[in-house]
Curated annotation (Swiss-Prot):
This is Cell division protein FtsL. The lineage of its organism: Bacteria, Pseudomonadati, Pseudomonadota, Gammaproteobacteria, Pasteurellales. Essential cell division protein. May link together the upstream cell division proteins, which are predominantly cytoplasmic, with the downstream cell division proteins, which are predominantly periplasmic. It comes from the Bacteria. HAMAP family: FtsL. Keywords: Cell cycle, Cell division, Cell inner membrane, Cell membrane, Membrane, Transmembrane, Transmembrane helix. Residues 46-107 are periplasmic.
Length: 107
């Protein structure tokens, strides 16, 4: 036979057959390692997403707490009786009624 006419062996087929026939444990371990690696990557990704979401929720909670405190201060300020009296006198031109000017209506 000449050099070009030598029979060629299908190397890929031989390797695959050898791998699955005599190295089943190695193949199973390799599959296990790949599954474990993908699981680790997925868990890490989900953990980072949850940490990011937690940070955003903390910022929202702080903003809501600040707004609540501001509303409490505003309510205390606007509900103050001296402020209400001053607005009634200056804006609405109301006057304080003396006891002689009071009229009591009975039925």
């Amino acid at each position: 036979m000449s050099e070009n006419n030598k029979p060629r062996y299908p190397l890929q087929q031989i390797l695959v057959e050898d791998l699955f026939s005599s190295n089943k444990l190695v193949v199973l371990l390799l599959i296990g390692i790949l599954v474990s690696a993908m699981g680790t990557i997925w868990i890490t990704h989900k953990t980072r997403q949850l940490i990011s979401e937690n940070g955003m929720l903390i910022l929202q909670r702080q903003a809501l707490e600040n707004e609540y405190r501001n509303l409490q201060v505003q309510e205390a300020t606007e509900g103050d009786s001296t402020r209400v009296e001053s607005i009634a006198i200056s804006t609405l031109k109301m006057k304080v009624v003396s006891s002689e000017q009071e009229v009591e209506i009975r039925e």
